[in-house]
Regions:
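Active-site metal-binding loops of divalent metal-dependent hydrolases
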Residues: 11-13
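Short Gly/charged-rich anion-binding patches and loops
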Residues: 34, 62, 136
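Short amphipathic alpha-helix
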Residues: 32-38
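Conserved N-terminal subdomain of the carbohydrate kinase-like
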Residues: 3-4, 15-26, 41-126, 140
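Glycosyltransferases and closely related glycan-assembly transferases
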Residues: 134-142
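Short, well-ordered, mixed-charge alpha-helical segments that flank or form enzyme active sites
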Residues: 17, 131-135
């Protein structure tokens, strides 16, 4: 395909620690990873998905591993320069109830993080709070 569809998915990729009600501990990356993978599967060879997120340096390899089987996911929008990502603790008390704690917040996504992706056909925003994507970024894209 000459001009594949390009979709940007912006927001945190938190390092999630999940404590199940059966006391199992699961470590995964969440939030933006889910729509990125879904869009990757939908687009297949007809497009590329670019997650845009600020992360901790120690999460670079783990996040790359999350997306390794998806050849149309381009990690050029992942930034660890400031070494500030999101960390979430999910503690399931039983099958239906959980406590969630945000232990660290990523630096917000600013226009400089989006600038090289303005040619995208679509932007998908997946913030956990109103802090992750600055208003100036939304105005910049508009």
């Amino acid at each position: 395909m000459a001009n594949p569809l390009k979709i940007v998915v912006a927001g945190p990729i938190p390092r999630d620690t999940i404590s199940t009600y059966e006391n199992d501990i699961i470590m995964r990356y969440g939030c933006v990873t889910h729509p990125v993978i879904a869009l990757s599967k939908l687009l297949d060879t007809n497009g590329v998905v670019i997650p845009v997120s600020n992360i901790h340096k120690k999460d670079i390899d783990g996040i790359a591993n999350e997306f390794k089987e998806f050849s149309n996911v381009n990690l050029a929008g992942i930034n660890s320069k400031k070494d500030r990502g999101t960390v979430i603790l999910l503690d399931f008390k039983d099958q239906n109830n959980r406590e969630e704690k945000q232990l660290a917040c990523m630096n917000p996504i600013r226009p400089k993080h989006i600038k090289k992706h303005l040619d995208a056909a679509a932007f998908v925003f997946v913030p956990i709070t109103d802090f992750e994507i600055s208003l100036s970024t939304l105005k910049y894209i508009k």
